[in-house]
Amino acid sequence: MAELVCDALATLTRNTYGDNDESAKFCRMFRTMIRDSGLYGNIENWRAAFYRERLPKRMSHSTVSIQLDNLEREVLKIRAEGFCQGYTRKERTLNAFDLSDDGKGNTIIKPTTHLSSIILQNSYNSAFKLPKIPDGLLEKTRYELEEEKKNNDILKQKIKELENTISQLENYENEAKASQFVLEHLKFTNESLKIQRDEAQICLIGLCNKFGLQCEIDNSIHVTESDKKGKRKGRKNRRIEVSFGAPGHDLTEQISTLSDVE
């Protein structure tokens, strides 16, 4: 549709000022101007809406009214400018028709625009009417739009919940990494303490052998006198546990703790 407007203006310019470079330059500037201002796109969009949908999608009633009003003003302005150049209603109407052949050798008038097709229908059919919007279509579209809005709100809520869940899982992951680091450190410390325990037990056994004592290492450490010593009269034959350290300071308990390292 916008190209038809450009072609009409180009035809008028060539007929008025001649087919020269200045006329061609003016037509190019006009096409650039309507593209830059958005008029070109508006005309094409409304033409597509009229042919395919009758009403554009995703427009409120007020937006449709404003767009129709703007389109009407733009068309009237173009018609007014064309009229000043001698492009009257008669010329505009006749320019929308072309001569053609019906295939049987008969010359016929062929409409080139949607409006010219309507004019031709009105010429021989007085009862001709444009099809109306199907009953209930607007209400159905509005209901579907509301349902889509509800679904969109639900999806937004779900996305927000998923974002919170992801954030919580990331926190759990960080805590797990920190716990893993602590466990690795404790494992290393435990291994070091086991080595120290084994070394201390070896040293203790060596000392016991040196001084003729017996050292029993199980879940705990017990150091007793050797069985090689003679029995004492009047007493049962039992081992006497040996205490270490200065008087009042018993090291046996401290030595026993060496076997508690797991």
UniProtKB/Swiss-Prot annotation:
Residue span of region Disordered: 224-248
List where this protein forms a coiled coil.
Answer: 138-179
Q: Where in the cell is it found?
A: Host cytoplasm
What Gene Ontology molecular function terms does this protein carry? RNA binding
- Domain of life the protein comes from: Viruses
Which positions carry the signal peptide feature in this UniProt record? none
GO cellular component entries = host cell cytoplasm
Per the UniProt entry, what is one GO biological process? regulation of translation
Give me the stretches of Basic residues compositional bias.
Answer: 229-238
Q: What is its main location?
A: host cell
Alphabetized, the UniProt keywords read: Coiled coil, Host cytoplasm, RNA-binding, Translation regulation
Any idea what job this protein has? May play a role in stimulating the translation of viral mRNAs.
Name of protein: Non-structural protein 3
Source species of the chain: Rotavirus X (strain RVX/Human/China/NADRV-J19/1997/GXP[X]) (RV ADRV-N)
